[in-house]
Amino acid sequence: MVGLLTSVTIFEGYDVTIFHLCTPDIARTFHMSDLDVGAMASIVRLGEMMAFVVVMLADRVGRKPIVSYTVLFYTLFTLMTALSHGLRTFTGFQSLAQLFLSGEFGVATIMISEEFPDRWRGRGVAILNMTGLIGVIAGGLFYGPVAGSRWGWRGMYFIGIAPLLLVALLRRNLRETVRFTELKRKHRGETSFVNGLRESAAQAFRGLSGPYRGRLLLVAMLWNCVMLVGAPAVTFFSLYAIRDRLWTRSQVGSAVVLAYIIGTFGHVLAGYMLDRVGRKLTTCASYVAGAAAIMLLFQTAGHTEMLTAMVATVFAFQVARTATATYSAELFPTEIRATSYSLTVQLLGRITALLTPLTIGALSRWLGGLGNAVAAVSIGPVIGAVLVALFAPETRGKPLEELAASSRETTFGSEKAAAPSG
């Protein structure tokens, strides 16, 4: 199962990397200003938010069908992205591609969390995330020769089509998770698909006023804090480095590959720290480190200093992403796990990812450039660290069923921070 699911992070790594690297080329093709780039990135991320609907379906039809079909739709819209002839079609097709890619990743995380032993869940999510390095390296290596050829940035999207079709074929052998199979057996025939889907949607938002309200709001706020590092790094680094700091395509490609190679050890460290010292300390430390690193990245001018800050930013972001994804998948019961995950990660937790690129694009003119605009939003992860320290429960080593049963309303509508379990 792990092998069949890790392909999602490989393609996510590749997709994020080529969007990351090709931004200057795309901006040149469509004659875009910083504000245009920010608006494009925000609309593309709107697709990620709409993945909430796709992941919600996994609580009704199962985990396996969703991860099997999302890869096909992602392949289709990746192809359409490569064939787009204007900014509107490019943005629209990329937004739809992100809808299915983000949905696929969300369900894959749920499946790993449900199938791995309790004491290894953190490492399981870390393994899923760290395989994205393969896609990052591929994107970085292809960028120079492909984007510089007559194929341009479109060639970067064409490259991923054949592997995606192969993955779609192999996914036919994927099995359903044991927890979901048992859940469906218990509730077989109780409601129709349409009524069940309506119930899932109602239940998702009903959770905002129910026993899991605090957990939903907390996890959503944490993802928003994480995205204040991830969104500007992905959207603007390449443009900032090439246009404002006069880096070459080769230098940018090499920097991204190096950053993600070293950053992969962030997933390894996160998996170890999550299961050894706990969720709270790991999450807090990664948030603070990410805030400091991205501020340095966009406030330094020297090549060595920028490269070092880029590596530190990616490393911290990978630790933070793994830590937050682990919380997202642990804090809700099986019957609403996928729905709650998608509500917190893909919908409510993506508000800053949606707004930050547009905000930075607008602020860049007022604050004297991209560097100052990014620095203005870098405080976000520090706020996230404070929220974790004050309100997040310690979930290390606890069975999912125990965590679901322990939910109770307190200040902030969530459980008080629990003491770390042995």
Please state what every model-predicted region is.
Residues 335-367:
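A late C-terminal transmembrane helix in Major Facilitator Superfamily
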Residues 20-51, 250:
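Extracellular/periplasmic helix-loop-helix junction of adjacent transmembrane segments
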Residues 42-56, 257-269:
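Central cavity-lining transmembrane alpha-helices of secondary-active solute carriers
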Residues 19-20, 211-264:
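Extracytoplasmic gate region of multi-pass secondary transporters
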Residues 121-148, 345-356:
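Glycine-rich segments within core transmembrane alpha-helices of 12-TM secondary carriers
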Residues 50-85, 274-277:
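Conserved MFS/SLC helix-loop-helix module at the cytosolic interface between two early adjacent transmembrane helices
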Residues 92-130:
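Cytoplasmic helix-loop-helix junction between adjacent transmembrane helices
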Residues 31, 62, 83-89, 117, ...:
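Helix-breaking motifs and short loop linkers at transmembrane-helix boundaries and internal kinks
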